[in-house]
Amino acid sequence: MTIDAALADKIRRTPKAELHVHIEGTLEPELIFRLAQRNHVNLPYPSVEALRAAYAFTDLQSFLDIYYAGASVLLTEEDFFDMTMDYVKRAVADNVRHAEIFFDPQTHTARGVPIGTVIDGISDALAQARTEYDFSSSLILCFLRHLSEEDAFATLEAALPYRDRFVGVGLDSSEKGNPPEKFARVFTRARELGLHLVAHAGEEGPAQYVTDALDILKVERIDHGVRSIDDAALIERLARERVALTVCPLSNQKLKVHPDLSEHPLKRMLDAGVAITLHSDDPAYFGGYMNANWEATFAALPLDAADAHKLARNSFEAAFLPPMQKAEFLAEVDHFWSATPTSPPATAPAA
């Protein structure tokens, strides 16, 4: 399926919010090698090309193995700053106006990197991005679900001196054997602290994990959530309660969650009234940032301009933004879609 040229242009230019991107997953091979040289880290790959070739993983676990290996080059505030600025430049080029960025402190503290180094480096880059690019952003601290809840508690407590730097907590890494209820107490603690709550659920795990994330963890947003399609009552609930799903199509394709994008359920869920949003997840590893995900999705599924407007709107509606700023972004989206033609203008007759 090909996209109409005018619609393709519009989905590239529409204002967007990115709500599901792991900052460590934006590490391109070139930057990994540059940081490895700067920090004298030996990589098990002889070249950038060899590292890129290793990105031929086939499932979530094989991806996570190389993901954590790539993160090993991140040691200083400057490293985290450079990684974040590289992402921001790509996001700005894709007309991302606001991003809520995941970071995994346990990946770094386990290697002896202080949590302050992680948060300061990322935060400094985002502060510069706000000034330099008018790029709105916030941070979400993610717990690694293959580790213990005690480790998550320790991470949350260690992050509290930086409480003003992040707006919420999330839950990522492998779902297998790590159900939402494993982290019930730490999510209760985060809620008491006034933090927003999100969680990965229903990617490789069942639809029941989505329900459990809502009922046990009390999350406000579901990351991935594509297995929700297996439960009609859950789909009705998501639509009724306006619970957003942060869907990552190229990630789903690469990890074989949905190998054929033409069979991806996001269009069916969108038509059912679910607040679907599109994001890049770990774009350096999955072959595409925001616009690549939008373009691949529209090429694979029967989506039109009204769907694109809805997807862009959903991304800002689901964002953890102050009401006035959210209203401004929504007005920007609505103006874009009402003011820009969705098909090429007719050619004027010759005089």
Curated annotation (Swiss-Prot):
The keyword Zinc applies. InterPro entries: A_deaminase_dom, ADE, Ado/ade_deaminase, Metal_Hydrolase. Belongs to the metallo-dependent hydrolases superfamily. Adenosine and AMP deaminases family. Adenine deaminase type 2 subfamily. It catalyses: adenine + H2O + H(+) = hypoxanthine + NH4(+). Binds 1 zinc ion per subunit. This is Adenine deaminase. Its EC number is 3.5.4.2. Disulfide bonds: none annotated. Pfam families: A_deaminase. Catalyzes the hydrolytic deamination of adenine to hypoxanthine. Plays an important role in the purine salvage pathway and in nitrogen catabolism. GO terms for molecular function: adenine deaminase activity; zinc ion binding. Its cofactor is Zn(2+).
